[in-house]
A protein has these predicted regions:
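Active-site core of glycosidic bond-cleaving carbohydrate-active enzymes
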Residues: 1-195, 199-208
């Protein structure tokens, strides 16, 4: 679509719409009604409603293409990272909300025991890498290594969720190599915590990336 003015204008209008669903008074993305007003009541732990298979703790970080803009909504790097810290330190409380009962994504989050971090579903999988955008790459490295070692293993509980479009395995492979594309389709990768001293990737043209 390079050079297509129509789609350029469409995406230019849409790419910053996430700012319209961020409520600074509560520090979360949240749903709005047809009248443009915030949906009430609001509980960031409650699943469903405006969120598919997740809650506000999961979807607030889903701004893959403009992380700097997301950080600005919180007011500073420090406020942003403090909020991310809370994801891991909160209890793994489940509130089914509009689902009316526990679905497997909820149970996977509970079993993981990493607070409100729900690695079993895609919306929050990139979140540990966002520390690097806010000046705390060591937290990216720490939490990525925790996820790799605690949630993946060679047992019946060694795969932490659905393999939707290859997301679960590709997260592990890239994170094990020490790189991750927060915004897929770009040539930008965040450095994480590699498991190997050396790795060689054979590209489709036969070249080697070492």
């Amino acid at each position: 679509m390079i050079g297509n003015k129509h789609y350029q204008e469409v995406f230019a209008r849409q790419m910053y719409n996430y700012k319209n669903v961020f409520d600074p008074s509560v520090g979360f993305m949240r749903g709005k009604g047809l009248d443009g007003k915030w949906q009430e009541p609001f509980d960031p732990l409650e699943w469903g409603g405006p969120f598919c298979e997740g809650n506000a703790w999961h979807y607030t970080w889903s701004v893959f293409h403009d992380v700097e803009g997301l950080i600005d909504l919180f007011g500073s790097d420090q406020k942003f990272t403090i909020k991310m810290d809370s994801v891991f330190t909160l209890p793994s409380t489940i509130k089914p909300g509009t689902y009316g009962g526990v679905i497997h994504e909820m149970k996977e989050m509970e079993l993981a025991g990493m607070g409100q971090y729900a690695h079993g579903n895609q919306p929050i999988q990139h979140m540990p890498y966002l520390y690097s955008y806010a000046g705390q790459p060591w937290k990216t490295q720490y939490w990525v290594r925790q996820i790799v070692e605690r949630l993946y293993n060679a047992t019946e509980r060694g795969y932490p969720g659905d393999e939707d479009q290859g997301g679960m395995s590709s997260w592990y492979i890239l994170s094990s190599l020490g790189i991750y594309a927060v915004c897929p389709g770009t040539d930008e990768y965040v450095i994480g915590s590699p498991l190997f001293k050396k790795a060689t990737i054979t590209l489709e043209n036969g070249n080697k990336f070492v």
